[in-house]
Amino acid sequence: MKKAEMGRFNISPDEDSSSYSSNSDFNYSYPTKQAALKSHYADVDPENQNFLLESNLGKKKYETDFHPGTTSFGMSVFNLSNAIVGSGILGLSYAMANTGIALFIILLTFVSIFSLYSVHLLLKTANEGGSLLYEQLGHKAFGMVGKLTASGSITMQNIGAMSSYLFIVKYELPLVIQALMNIEDTNGLWYLNGDYLVLLVSLVLILPLSLLRNLGYLGYTSGLSLLCMMFFLIVVIFKKFQISCPAEIAFLVNETVNSSLTQPATFLPDMGFNRTESDSCQPRYFIFNSQTVYAVPILTFSFVCHPAILPIYEELKGRSRRRMMNVSKISFFAMFLMYLLAALFGYLTFYGHVESELLHTYSSVMETDILLLIVRLAVLVAVTLTVPVVIFPIRSSITHLLCASKEFSWWRHSVITVSILVFTNLLVIFVPNIRDIFGFIGASAAAMLIFILPSAFYIKLVKKEPMKSVQKIGAMFFLLSGIVVMTGSMALIVLDWVHNAPGGGH
């Protein structure tokens, strides 16, 4: 360990003065679910730039001198916004339809504030613990168990994100092909079957890109994804004023939805909207039903960006914890508004008949709309190019765990890549609904990354604050809240699965 490495923090003494332990992992930089952050060392073998576990740069004789951040404040805000926004935005209208407007806003506010608070804990823990690597903080706090827990949570979150992207391909690509080919009768056409199309896209497009040894241009897909989601938001708002609320929406959703969804609307009778035709298009503010349990996991899934916080912090020009918190506040507030508007206008368009993937709901009432077709194409391109970015850190983590001391092997590289893709494709084919991905990952990995791990690391590693201090008591309360959220949400989701299993309720 070298003392010079700690100089790279460049923390203002008046702000973060504390005794740091040394750390050899500050050269770390990796892509999140949306972004591939630029590495300091472009010449490092990509497979050895460990994205999920501690870097083994001892073998590479690099300088560990003071390294100031080079990314501007505005670009850091953009990078963090890229890391936050993801496919979860497509499920927010469904969450609002099962909570009501007022309850959704309350939950969204609390989840965003809690997520921001966990960023505060994570940054302070990084300074005290002397590491800018999430998993290394786990190792410093709880040894190998902490390291594996952090690594496993991030890997689960990445697999969930990748699955949600492929679900979008499964849902939307058949509709795009149908619209482009002007096909009326879809019965028996294999190229309109979502399962076949996911396999085809994975084999022809995603696999070759995923086999690359470095990310290259794929790193720019983060910006493309954010732009696509902003375009999606604009279209959602515009369509609210173009689509009147037809009384027959429920019929349309159940009868005309494309076969790429596995029983897509069978959960509608259980949604708790017992209304007449006259009030079917009236907004509701508080709703409690069997699907309300998915709201918090969907929201937590949508706000996970914590593995990207430390790399962005490392790159920040004029690096200080206060400056990074300002970056986080602006990014979280921007995404809060974006999520709220997308959920609100999507809900006010379809009310209680929103599907778990909002974009697919439009196919029930506007099958041939050109603007929606453009949105679908943009989203499909973005998510298809993002999947290899997400595979990269998962593969690096597995390689490090299983073959850390071995030289690079194309055979091993290919087998791990194919295995990840096969596993994810099986999830997408056999898990009936994207809501289940949002719910399960949001209740497990996302809850770990937002609530449990940052607070646990803070309690363990920040030594200068006594356990009876307000800060430690707050962190302890946050930890307990995370455990309650995770166990409660998981239990209710499993109960919902069991309850609906006989009738195929998903």
From Swiss-Prot:
Disulfide bonds join 245-281. The gene is SLC38A2. Residues 97-102, 178-188, 239-292, 351-371, 435-436, 496-506 are extracellular. The keyword Ubl conjugation applies. Belongs to the amino acid/polyamine transporter 2 family. Its main location: membrane. It comes from the Eukaryota. The keyword Membrane applies. This is Sodium-coupled neutral amino acid symporter 2. The lineage of its organism: Eukaryota, Metazoa, Chordata, Craniata, Vertebrata. The chain crosses the membrane at residues 77-96, 103-123, 159-177, 189-209, 218-238, 293-313, 330-350, 372-392, 414-434, 437-457, 473-495. It comes from Bos taurus (Bovine). Inhibited by N-methyl-D-glucamine. Inhibited by choline. Allosteric regulation of sodium ions binding by pH. It catalyses: L-alanine(in) + Na(+)(in) = L-alanine(out) + Na(+)(out); glycine(in) + Na(+)(in) = glycine(out) + Na(+)(out); L-serine(in) + Na(+)(in) = L-serine(out) + Na(+)(out); L-proline(in) + Na(+)(in) = L-proline(out) + Na(+)(out). The extracellular C-terminal domain controls the voltage dependence for amino acid transports activity. Polyubiquitination by NEDD4L regulates the degradation and the activity of SLC38A2. GO terms for cellular component: cytoplasm; plasma membrane. GO terms for biological process: alanine transport; amino acid import; amino acid transmembrane transport; amino acid transport; cellular response to arsenite(3-); glutamine transport; L-glutamine import across plasma membrane; L-proline import across plasma membrane. Residues 1-76, 124-158, 210-217, 314-329, 393-413, 458-472 are cytoplasmic. Glycans are attached at residues 258, 274. Residues 1-23 are annotated as: Disordered. The modification Phosphoserine is found at residues 12, 21-22, 55.
